[in-house]
From Swiss-Prot:
Catalyzes the hydrolysis of N(2)-succinylarginine into N(2)-succinylornithine, ammonia and CO(2). It catalyses: N(2)-succinyl-L-arginine + 2 H2O + 2 H(+) = N(2)-succinyl-L-ornithine + 2 NH4(+) + CO2. Homodimer. This is N-succinylarginine dihydrolase. One of its GO terms (biological process) is arginine catabolic process to succinate. It holds the Pfam family AstB. It comes from Aliivibrio fischeri (strain MJ11) (Vibrio fischeri). Substrate binds at residues 19-28, 110, 137-138, 214, 252, 362.
Length: 444
């Protein structure tokens, strides 16, 4: 059966704001306390989804989290009505309210790790939500993320859903942002590539000194076991600790892969020559590494433009397209390198840029916004069809955003009880549009 690599992008939630919550993410911290535009953000995301749909790709939509997260604020000791909980939390700990109001679930590369049926011993697609324990504001996502994934991929004949790994630093897991897959054809056995920042149990591994390593070797190994992956087609590699300390908080900020191609920076991995050798050994002949030299693109330029936080996708005619943030065009060194790369015909054939300013200012580019899910024909039919991008869904979701989303949010607005009402109303309607059922705590 012919398989495709679909992309499921996260809808930006109604509380999209710039609270600078992500230590190690330079863009997030540098735009702290700025004024956000949730309506523009959700529409920018929808435009990208629609563009990929129009190019002929299978494009899905994943719902956002319920925010502000009143349930978590109550667990942390704030009581009274929902309005009082918001008021008290803003009065005593505005940082906590900001964390419980984050729309960071838009970056579905962190939603979880997905292994296609061609790679798993039981022949089913496996999903594990990421525990995201390194950042409090993201560590409260995995239960609802699991609900959203189950409502989107519900057929137990084809899909297996696991719980997130234990909420412990030993098993810190950041999902598909540290995972990619190489293959000849999407429906054939592939090589799954897990990248970690540190080992929790083995102190002989190097670790970054300035910023945290969010993914552990132990977490990556646990997911490979849970998904039933074949050892000879599974490769583990350590991210270069030095680039983590320079703002490369996930591997997808310094490398991206698709089919037979790894597009990475010269300084992406520790022992990079061995990593390339291991991948070539698992993949076999024809593996293509495009390694960007530091003298062409510095790590700083890579982080500032999100060159590698791009999408490498293969079109129906076999050509490879790279989806880039507009920031890449605006950097003369990066743009010159990319055009040189196209001219050299080394495996990337076309460039396509998108304006994702609202997401980029919070530290997330095109690759952050999507979760890749390889599906064969039967699995495609088993997906909740109301979550797949179409002309109708694009129009409906734009009208939905116009109805429910604000065009301006600053820190103090998070304490506004009306924002909670607006957010819940939006999500309640969204679950009906996308036939998701009662996936949110307020709907129980």
């Amino acid at each position: 059966m012919k398989a495709v690599e679909s992309n499921f992008d996260g809808l930006v939630g109604p509380t999209h704001n710039y609270s600078g919550l992500s230590v190690g993410n330079i863009a997030s911290k540098s735009n702290q306390s700025g004024v956000s535009n949730p309506k523009q953000a959700v529409k920018q995301g929808l435009e990208k989804m629609k563009a990929l749909h129009d190019m002929g790709f299978v494009q899905g939509v994943l719902a956002p989290q319920e925010r502000p997260d009143i349930h978590t604020l109550r667990r942390l000791g704030f009581s009274g009505s929902d309005s009082e909980v918001l008021k008290k939390s803003y009065q005593y700990s505005p940082q906590l309210l900001a964390a419980c109001s984050s729309a960071s679930s838009m970056w579905t590369a962190n939603a979880g790790t997905v292994s296609p049926s061609a790679d798993t011993t039981d022949g089913k697609v496996h999903f594990t939500p990421a525990n995201l324990i390194n950042k409090f504001h993201r560590s409260i996502e995995d239960q609802v993320t699991g609900n959203i994934l189950k409502a989107t991929f519900s057929d137990e004949k084809h899909f297996v859903h696991h719980e997130a790994l234990p909420h412990s630093d030993y098993f810190g897991d950041e999902g598909a942002a540290n995972h990619t897959r190489f293959c000849r054809e999407y429906g054939e056995q592939g090589v799954e590539f897990f990248v970690f920042g540190k080992s929790a149990f083995n102190e002989s591994y190097l670790a970054p000194k300035k910023y945290p390593a969010r993914q552990t070797l132990e977490a990556s190994e646990a997911i490979a076991r849970t998904h039933g992956l074949r050892e000879q087609f599974t490769v583990f590699a350590q991210q270069n600790p030095d680039v983590i300390d320079r703002g490369v908080f996930h591997n997808d900020v310094i490398a991206v892969g698709n089919k037979n191609t790894l597009f990475c920076h010269q300084q992406a991995f520790l022992n990079q020559e061995k990593v390339k050798s291991d991948l070539c050994a698992s993949y076999g002949s024809g593996f293509n590494v495009i390694e960007v030299p530091t003298d062409k693109v510095s790590v700083q330029d890579a982080v500032e433009t999100y060159l590698f936080n791009s999408q490498l996708i293969t079109k129906a005619d076999g050509t490879t397209l790279i989806i880039l943030p507009e920031h890449c065009r605006q950097n003369s060194r990066v743009w010159a390198y990319l055009n040189e790369l196209i001219e050299q015909k080394r495996g990337i054939d076309e460039l396509h840029t998108f304006d994702l300013k609202q997401s980029m200012q919070n530290g997330g580019g095109p690759a952050c916004l999507r979760l890749r899910v390889v599906l064969n024909e039967a699995e495609q039919k088993a997906v909740n069809q109301h979550t797949l991008m179409s002309e109708e869904l694009f129009t409906t979701l734009n009208l939905w955003a116009d109805k429910h989303y604000r065009d301006r949010i600053e820190d103090k607005d998070l304490a506004d009880s009306q924002l909670l009402v607006e957010s819940r109303s939006a999500l309640d309607e969204l679950t009906q549009i996308m036939h998701l059922g009662s996936i949110y705590p307020f709907q129980k």
